Amino acid sequence: CPVAAQGRHGDGSWCKYKQMIPLNLPSFNIKTKVQGGRTLVFDFLRRRYVTLTPEEWVRQHFVHFLVEHKGYPAALLGNEVGLKVGGVSRRCDSVLYHRDGGRPRAIVEYKAPSVPITQQVFTQIASYNSVLRADYLFVTNGINHYCCHIDYEAGNVEYLREIPAYPELK
């Protein structure tokens, strides 16, 4: 259960969802509930409960990490952002926008902890970025995190050792 440390949900019910594995991210007080036999988690960016899946577990932890530990403004982040890639509707897992004009500054692709980060995952986020043209790409499965900075003028992609703090973004 994602709230195994407490053993119970905030409403006092026991978690019926399969065990979520610990992530390579800071823990936080995650808000969950059971409704209609499904475990839901509160997404504070979307301001609603969503189905708790392994990928959603990673998303909630990573967004919390960005906001609480790296100083990213929650008001500039969006989850499940729609876009069209080659005429096909897709959803980018998370987007960080620029303060001025709302242009995407970074995009994030999440995978479940059991899903390895492969070239296919980087190809997926690159296809989204062909439309969004963000300066940073983050890929994580909650265990391994990858970040690259794209310099469009120089035509360079720089892989970074760690996720930069918000004030460090170029």
Predicted regions mapped to residue ranges:
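Acidic, Ala/Val/Gly-enriched low-complexity intrinsically disordered segments
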Residues: 3-5, 11
